[in-house]
Amino acid sequence: MAMAASSAVAASCFTLASNAICSSNLGTSPGLVLRKSVFYCANAELKCRGRKASQFTRRVGSCSTARASAADVKTSEVAVGQATMDEIVPAVIVGAGRVGTALEKMGGGKDFVVRRGETIPADKPGPIIVCTRNDVLSSIIDSTPSNRREDLVFVQNGMLDPLLESKGLTATQVLVYFAVAKLGDPPTDGITDLNPEGLTAASGKWASAIAARLKSAGLSCKVLDPEEFKKPQLEKLIWICAFMLVGARHPGSTVGDVESKHRDELASLVEELAAAAESEKNIKFDSGVVDRLCAYARSVSHFPTAVKEFEWRNGFFYNISQRALADGLSDPCPTHTAWLKEVGAIKS
């Protein structure tokens, strides 16, 4: 009976290692699976203690095979990472702050960094990754050589579509769900318990190049077509608008406080903004929006809250309200409007 149990454990060990190899081939990090493999191997060896040598050898042999397979996977994973690094497309990076510096470090010294006051070169090919504040985006676009504007890549929070449309651009956009704590620190991926595969996404001409760059640093990034991009783009906008506004109603609140202490307020606001976004952009969110946004909040629970960059964030929904009222219709976002007035973001 004990021998059968030990055999089953050893077999599980080998199966897990094999699955890890399959995960690696699919582009999924096998780290968690490998750790489980080693755990099961240890258990198999413990269960084998006290058995005859031949029995023990057989059990440990299976575990040794699994460990060898796990080692092969680890080696393969390193090789895949190196191959990705070799294939990274050199870029022009505008801005040398936390995000810009982190992205430049992923480029292996092949990127060209444009700092404040410098001009974007016309003769450098590849993506132009803009890592600046939103309020200078218009001037950056205008100062970019006209033949290079289609190569612009934007990583900012907020709704950029109106600006890009006004400039006649269909540029690459990235929904950044990784965080850089301070200048020079490596980025931390914003994976959640509901989305362990990661949430960062890119769409546009250089989306695949951006994904390769991020994945070389161990970060996730989905490549989406423009239609697929709309829903996660708006979900992230709703996240930052709702969490920041509810937090502003409760001074000193962190994102985690909003999620854990004021969830009812948050849920009502998220549902209101989601309905407005669906109507405005002719989309339908997948069920569970509130749960997904709260899951992300838990991964960045220490972030402070404040209503800022109004034009790019809450301004998107406030403009929807203003247009409706101008047409003699009711405000589709009455709670949002009332709370903006309450915190002083707009005039009463």
Model-identified regions with their sequence ranges:
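N-terminal chloroplast transit peptides
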Residues: 1-55
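NAD(P)-dependent Rossmann-like dehydrogenase/reductase catalytic/cofactor-binding core
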Residues: 52, 56-67, 72-90, 264-348
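Hydrophobic, well-ordered beta-alpha structural blocks that scaffold small-molecule cofactor pockets
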Residues: 56-126, 131-141
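Structural alpha-beta junctions
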Residues: 58-61, 108-113, 147-151, 168-175, ...
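Helix-loop-beta segment of a Rossmann-like dinucleotide-binding subdomain
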Residues: 81, 86-90, 187-198, 250-259, ...
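Rossmann-like NAD(P)(H) cofactor-binding subdomain of soluble oxidoreductases
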Residues: 100-107, 117-192
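Rossmann-fold dinucleotide-binding core
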Residues: 154-238, 242
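Active-site-proximal catalytic alpha-helix in oxidoreductases
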Residues: 208, 213, 229-274
